[in-house]
């Protein structure tokens, strides 16, 4: 009876210190190689602007594009005509062609001014062919541009909210050409992890083999898992649908601290651990005060000159420098509490974390972006 009680107590203690792995589906961890969006781009014209279009004297390509379009419609513009247009803007149109898209489907497009138009709000995009990297036309875009910004100007004053030189057209492009694909034609499909991890790649491979049979999946490297699939489109769809929903017990990832040197942001995951250390951080500030002193002659007609003499004063102040103890912190809450106790700004915290890593007190990978 006593032995059974000790075993029960030991199991309870182990459950307190064990960090459970989170269960996720394979579909949340991988992408299927070859199943991706394809970028499309085109050049077009937006018309119907209320005097906020391109200034054609400064953007000659707008006038040239309009002349070419009119000639295609059977309207000839005499050479040398100076068209003073204010309601036309040259734009670049971009879109993403989803995988397995079929002719007749519609996709969203983004319209961005490339001239000096003040706003394309309320404009209409004329028919614009969208091409892929192979210079083939895959979609045609046209429609009214929706701009999320707003602005007004009067009497030399202006106010603007958000961006007025770009907008979107929901379902503004119709797919005219289907993208050729060789997906699954050789009976092999590669699954790519969202981030490289040898352990996770082997776990995904083992999980697929347990459900679909040994040899169905093989981990090629830290990111790629090669899967043997049955031939035939419907069979492959069912096969992928089954393996995408297989649960995987994902172990906690590497301890990592991300520092954005431009914004001063510091982000860390739950696996970051701090060892005991002492930190002293001093703030050094330099103040430069410059004043111009004007010296003028006492008599207006004495022949003297007015002299401007700069008077510059520089002062240096250093604050802080008190040595503070940082206790060992085994979890994220304690890490945050320990770092906050230093009272450092985000900029100072970046230097402190770098020094902690060099001293071996920060048990995490430090990445600066």
Swiss-Prot record:
Family of this protein: Belongs to the FlgI family.
Gene name of the record: flgI2
Lineage of origin: Bacteria, Pseudomonadati, Pseudomonadota, Gammaproteobacteria, Enterobacterales
Annotated PANTHER family: FLAGELLAR P-RING PERIPLASMIC PROTEIN FLGI, FLAGELLAR P-RING PROTEIN
Family matches, as HAMAP family: FlgI
GO molecular function: structural molecule activity
Record-level GO cellular component terms: bacterial-type flagellum basal body, distal rod, P ring; outer membrane-bounded periplasmic space
Pfam families, per the entry: FlgI
Signal peptide: 1-23
Subcellular localization(s) per the UniProt record: Periplasm; Bacterial flagellum basal body
GO BP: bacterial-type flagellum-dependent cell motility
UniProt KW keywords: Bacterial flagellum, Periplasm, Signal
Superkingdom field: Bacteria
Function, as annotated: Assembles around the rod to form the L-ring and probably protects the motor/basal body from shearing forces during rotation.
Quaternary assembly: The basal body constitutes a major portion of the flagellar organelle and consists of four rings (L,P,S, and M) mounted on a central rod.
Protein name: Flagellar P-ring protein 2
Presence of keyword Signal: yes
The keyword Electron transport appears for this protein: no
